[in-house]
């Protein structure tokens, strides 16, 4: 192994936007990393996760034009009565 080719591995403080700080090790020379979210404020870890069903192309088509099979079945039931 060559000597002197590896970067220094220093103790680094990570600061989150929520105010949480923790210490880890990194090769970043300043010894300070600022992040927007961490495990203390990320919705997945806090349990405040909102599931957004944006749907895909099929859902968008069905919303725009309706489900062909569902409307057909509803129309035949009402016509039989």
Swiss-Prot record:
InterPro entries: Ribosomal_bL28/bL31-like_sf (IPR034704), Ribosomal_bL31 (IPR002150), Ribosomal_bL31_A (IPR027491), Ribosomal_bL31_sf (IPR042105). GO terms for biological process: translation. Zn(2+) binds at residues 16, 18, 38, 41. Signal peptide: none annotated. Its cofactor is Zn(2+). GO terms for molecular function: metal ion binding; rRNA binding; structural constituent of ribosome. It holds the Pfam family Ribosomal_L31. Keywords: Metal-binding, Ribonucleoprotein, Ribosomal protein, RNA-binding, rRNA-binding, Zinc. GO terms for cellular component: ribonucleoprotein complex; ribosome. Transmembrane segments: none annotated. It comes from the Bacteria. Binds 1 zinc ion per subunit. Binds the 23S rRNA. Belongs to the bacterial ribosomal protein bL31 family. Type A subfamily. Part of the 50S ribosomal subunit. HAMAP family: Ribosomal_bL31_1 (MF_00501). This is Large ribosomal subunit protein bL31. It comes from Mycobacterium sp. (strain KMS).
